[in-house]
Amino acid sequence: PTSQPRGDPTGPKE
């Protein structure tokens, strides 16, 4: 899921 910004390592990467 790309709900988090690309630069945010705490977010999901799919």
Swiss-Prot record:
Motif Cell attachment site: list the residue ranges.
6-8
Q: Decide whether keyword Heme is in the record.
A: no
Modification(s) after translation: Acetylation by EP300, CREBBP, GCN5L2/GCN5 and PCAF regulates the transactivation activity of Tat.
| A Gene Ontology term for the protein's cellular component | extracellular region
MF terms in GO: metal ion binding; RNA binding
Q: Superkingdom, according to UniProt?
A: Viruses
Location in the cell: Host nucleus, Host nucleolus; Host cytoplasm; Secreted
Q: What does this protein do?
A: Transcriptional activator that increases RNA Pol II processivity, thereby increasing the level of full-length viral transcripts. Recognizes a hairpin structure at the 5'-LTR of the nascent viral mRNAs referred to as the transactivation responsive RNA element (TAR) and recruits the cyclin T1-CDK9 complex (P-TEFb complex) that will in turn hyperphosphorylate the RNA polymerase II to allow efficient elongation. The CDK9 component of P-TEFb and other Tat-activated kinases hyperphosphorylate the C-terminus of RNA Pol II that becomes stabilized and much more processive. Extracellular circulating Tat can be endocytosed by surrounding uninfected cells via the binding to several surface receptors such as CD26, CXCR4, heparan sulfate proteoglycans (HSPG) or LDLR. Neurons are rarely infected, but they internalize Tat via their LDLR. Endosomal low pH allows Tat to cross the endosome membrane to enter the cytosol and eventually further translocate into the nucleus, thereby inducing severe cell dysfunctions ranging from cell activation to cell death.
Name the protein family: Belongs to the lentiviruses Tat family.
Extra facts: Isolates WMJ1, WMJ2, and WMJ3 were obtained from blood samples sequentially taken from a two-year old Haitian who was perinatally infected by her mother.
The Swiss-Prot or TrEMBL note on domains reads: The transactivation domain mediates the interaction with CCNT1, GCN5L2, and MDM2. The Arg-rich RNA-binding region binds the TAR RNA. This region also mediates the nuclear localization through direct binding to KPNB1 and is involved in Tat's transfer across cell membranes (protein transduction). The same region is required for the interaction with EP300, PCAF, EIF2AK2 and KDR.
Assembly description: Interacts with host CCNT1. Associates with the P-TEFb complex composed at least of Tat, P-TEFb (CDK9 and CCNT1), TAR RNA, RNA Pol II. Recruits the HATs CREBBP, TAF1/TFIID, EP300, PCAF and GCN5L2. Interacts with host KAT5/Tip60; this interaction targets the latter to degradation. Interacts with the host deacetylase SIRT1. Interacts with host capping enzyme RNGTT; this interaction stimulates RNGTT. Binds to host KDR, and to the host integrins ITGAV/ITGB3 and ITGA5/ITGB1. Interacts with host KPNB1/importin beta-1 without previous binding to KPNA1/importin alpha-1. Interacts with EIF2AK2.
Query: What is the designated name of this protein?
Result: Protein Tat
Give the originating organism. Answer: Human immunodeficiency virus type 1 group M subtype B (isolate WMJ22) (HIV-1)
